[in-house]
Design a protein with these regions (language model features):
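A short, Lys/Arg-enriched interface patch at domain edges and termini
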Residues: 54-71
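Amphipathic alpha-helical interface segments used for dimerization/assembly
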Residues: 17, 30, 34, 64-68
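Polyanion-binding surface elements
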Residues: 2-21
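Major-groove DNA-recognition helix of helix-turn-helix-type DNA-binding domains
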Residues: 20-55
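Ca2+-coordinating acidic residues in Ca2+-binding motifs
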Residues: 12, 29, 60
């Protein structure tokens, strides 16, 4: 990914992982992947993530990429 040193909107990041899906479907898929990975979910919560958040910090993006791979 070209820039993990910036905040990513949740849909913006989701589309990078699932570019052929609609933005809503891409976000639902990314959210499902996150929720299925307990270690990732715990790390994101430790970094301050809540389900109502609209963006991911660079540290959160880094952890997502660690567990899910680079989009």
């Amino acid at each position: 990914m070209d820039n993990i040193h910036k905040d990513y909107g949740r849909t913006e990041l989701a589309i990078r992982y699932s570019p052929t899906l609609t933005p809503d479907a891409a976000w639902k898929k990314l959210k499902r992947w996150i929720n299925l990975n307990r270690d990732l979910t715990q790390e994101l919560h430790a970094l301050g993530y809540t389900s109502h958040q609209r963006s991911f910090t660079p540290k959160m993006v880094s952890r997502i990429m660690f567990y899910l791979g680079e989009p």
